[in-house]
């Protein structure tokens, strides 16, 4: 934003979903507020709620719900998916938003687990992660790819299995970091991923993992995991922001 502003180029950023027709908001040309996607268009109601469904005031971030005649009636022949996102006309966008007192708002990330690729494909990461974690070489994983062309993954490997493989293949190393960056180890994990997540096992081609990075630390409760052992995706995305960026360069 500030780069284009310094160059004298006005950006009128907007926001919307395929399910919403699609445009919900756009910055006003007369008063473009940097860092926002503008105010909502006319006839669009909104709510920002916390994880318990409690309505939040401006300045507080939460999940954005919208209601309008332009909202879809449902997913074609998928009442199960429709029921997950639509309730009494209110659509759960799955996005985390915060509104200003003047009505503009910012999108801060995702609240739902669903990943939406650049091409519009909706992907549920948990079945993919469950399959990855079935590998004896993988302890934990998190699939990433929001607004990207393909999926990638953060992989927490089982170091004992990697060490066994290194001994078997005659791979020399001093520290774990050397082992994790070894091309033969990367190929070993790559082959594990490809053998599990593929079209033969019922996954669509866009659900396959095209890139990955190996992490040296396990996900921990209170940090990357909730007390029920679910991944805190927003937190993990923050902690491993650089690693995720490199996956899509």
Question: Model-found features: residue ranges?
Answer:
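Short coil-to-beta-strand transition motifs
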Residues: 38-43, 91
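Active-site glycine-centered loops adjacent to acidic/histidine catalytic or metal-binding residues
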Residues: 16, 38, 95
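Ser/Thr-glycine-rich phosphate-binding loops at phosphate-binding pockets of nucleotides
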Residues: 17-20, 93, 226-228
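Conserved C-terminal "lid"/linker of ANL adenylate-forming enzymes
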Residues: 115, 140-142, 190-249
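Conserved ATP-binding/catalytic segment of the ANL
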Residues: 47, 52-59, 63-117
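Gly/Ser/Thr-rich phosphate-binding loop
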Residues: 1-32
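Generic structural signal for well-ordered beta-strand positions
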Residues: 56-57, 106, 123, 226, ...
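AMP-binding/adenylate-forming catalytic core of the ANL superfamily
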Residues: 68, 73-74, 96-205
């Amino acid at each position: 934003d500030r780069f284009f502003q310094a160059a004298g180029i006005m950006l009128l950023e907007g926001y919307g979903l395929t399910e919403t027709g699609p445009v919900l908001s756009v910055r006003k040309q007369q008063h473009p507020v940097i860092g926002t996607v503008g105010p909502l268009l006319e006839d669009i109601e909104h709510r920002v709620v916390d994880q318990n469904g409690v309505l939040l005031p401006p300045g507080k971030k939460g999940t954005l719900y919208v209601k309008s005649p332009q909202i879809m009636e449902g997913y074609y022949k998928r009442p199960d998916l429709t029921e997950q996102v639509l309730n009494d006309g209110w659509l759960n966008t799955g996005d985390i938003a915060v509104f200003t007192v003047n009505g503009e708002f910012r999108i801060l990330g995702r609240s739902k687990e669903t990943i939406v690729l650049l091409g519009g494909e909706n992907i549920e990461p948990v079945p993919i992660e469950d399959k990855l974690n079935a590998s004896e070489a993988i302890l934990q994983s998190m699939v990433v790819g929001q607004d990207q062309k393909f999926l990638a993954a953060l992989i927490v490997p089982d170091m004992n299995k990697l060490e066994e493989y290194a001994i078997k293949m005659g791979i020399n190393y001093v520290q774990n970091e050397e082992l994790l960056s070894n091309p033969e180890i990367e190929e070993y994990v790559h082959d594990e991923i490809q053998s599990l997540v593929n079209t033969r096992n019922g996954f669509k081609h866009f659900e396959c993992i095209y890139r990955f990075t190996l992490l040296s630390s396990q996900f921990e409760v209170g940090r990357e995991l909730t007390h029920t052992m679910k991944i805190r995706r927003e937190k993990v995305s923050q902690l491993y922001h650089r690693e995720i960026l490199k996956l899509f360069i």
